[in-house]
Regions:
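Active-site recognition of the HExxH zinc-binding catalytic motif
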Residues: 72-84
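Metalloprotease/metallohydrolase-associated module, dominated by Zn2+-dependent proteases
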Residues: 2-69, 85-171
């Protein structure tokens, strides 16, 4: 077992704990929204910055309530980076775990996952359909694109060497 007997309700994720976690991840990275980011959000290779595409709105409004979406994206990117780079999970598995953390945070804020997911799908499609990404972050972590063998996106970013060699570098 885990070494302690859970108290009633301890199996549920508390909103206050998720708010604390979101605040902690927001403090540990700098958010940068001035670049073309093909997968909407990404980190730099050091894990000190989260890049969010310049075009993505910062707020989603649902039933008159405003939801700041940076915290959801940052939670996703930091969890993904931890599992992928520190714990050596594949990008695909790290992404699945990050989605679970992102979803828990979205729902704890009272935003229905279906509403948020629809919003994200629209923007993923819009940003993903660009013919090129002329202004990508110079130190973007390319591991997701490399792991997914997404050579087309790497070329549209101008990362031709990464597309050919699999090296995590924009040069």
């Amino acid at each position: 077992m885990w070494g302690h007997r859970p108290k009633a309700g301890e199996w549920l994720i508390r909103r206050s704990m998720l708010d604390e976690a979101a605040a902690a991840v927001m403090k540990c990275v700098r958010i940068v929204r001035k670049y073309d980011v093909p997968y909407v959000g990404s980190c730099n290779r050091k894990g000190t910055k989260v890049y969010i595409d310049y075009e993505l709105p910062t707020v989603l409004v649902h039933r008159g309530k405003r939801y700041e979406i940076d915290r959801y994206i940052v939670m996703h990117e930091v969890v993904e980076m931890l599992f992928e780079h520190q714990l050596k999970f594949s990008y695909r598995d790290a992404h699945q775990l990050a989605l679970r953390a992102e979803r828990a945070l979205v729902q704890s804020d009272g935003l229905p996952w279906t509403v948020y997911n629809r919003f994200c799908e629209r923007w993923i499609k819009r940003i993903g359909s660009r013919k090129s990404y002329p202004n990508p972050p110079p130190d973007i972590d390319l591991k997701p694109e490399i792991d997914e063998d997404d050579k087309a996106t790497l070329r549209r970013m101008g990362a031709k060497r990464a597309a050919k060699s699999g090296r995590d570098s924009m040069r």
